[in-house]
């Protein structure tokens, strides 16, 4: 109800014409919640872009969302090496499953981009090229690559500090013009 009121307010008062739902957990909702969102969003009647992870996508949710305005998706793929992705990022999905899931949006006319990260602690050149290779098998409309940022409070930040790649007092930024890690 609050989400509906806020979306309606921005559409009517600020003349918003497009929404972007920036949350990796957007599709973590159950079927009942998804159906309620779709019913509510029908009234908002604006195109939208959402962020999610490949493992959350299925025909049912993309079909429903495309009917109420889903225009584009950003997928957090992050890394192309299965073992590295599982060990370092705790994401235990097979590349073949990612490739298959990312065929679904095209069935419903939904464009998508994939987001990748490079420069992780312990990542090698070969591992980085595994990400490129995975992306060659995904028919994304756009592929992005970002530099790893060791944010405070994350397990990877702790790992970077333990490996003496960054000092504990260093404040990191999302956008930078120089390397963050030693």
Regions found by a protein language model. Name each.
Residues 1-8, 12-15:
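Acidic, low-complexity intrinsically disordered segments
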Residues 9, 31, 35-182:
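A structural motif corresponding to the C-terminal lobe/cap of the Radical SAM core domain
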Residues 18:
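Glycine-rich, aromatic-lined ligand/substrate-binding cores of catalytic
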Residues 22-25:
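Glycine-rich Rossmann NAD(P)(H)-binding loop
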Residues 28:
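Catalytic histidine-centered segment of alpha/beta-hydrolase-like enzymes
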């Amino acid at each position: 109800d609050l989400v509906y009121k806020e979306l309606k307010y921005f559409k009517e008062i600020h003349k918003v014409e497009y929404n972007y739902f920036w949350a990796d957990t957007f599709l973590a909702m159950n079927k009942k919640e998804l159906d309620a969102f779709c019913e509510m969003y029908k009234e908002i009647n604006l195109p939208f872009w959402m962020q999610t992870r490949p493992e959350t996508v299925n025909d049912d949710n993309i079909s429903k969302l495309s009917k109420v305005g889903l225009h584009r998706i950003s997928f957090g793929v992050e890394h192309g090496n299965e073992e590295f992705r599982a060990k370092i990022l705790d994401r235990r999905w097979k590349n073949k499953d990612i490739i298959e899931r990312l065929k679904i949006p095209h069935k419903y006319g939904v464009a998508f981009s994939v987001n990748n990260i490079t420069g992780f602690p312990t990542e090698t050149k070969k591992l980085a090229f595994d990400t490129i290779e995975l992306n060659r098998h995904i028919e994304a409309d756009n592929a992005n690559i970002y530099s790893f940022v060791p944010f405070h409070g994350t397990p990877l930040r702790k790992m970077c500090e333990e490996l003496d790649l960054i000092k504990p007092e260093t404040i990191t930024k999302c956008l930078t013009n120089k390397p963050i890690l030693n």
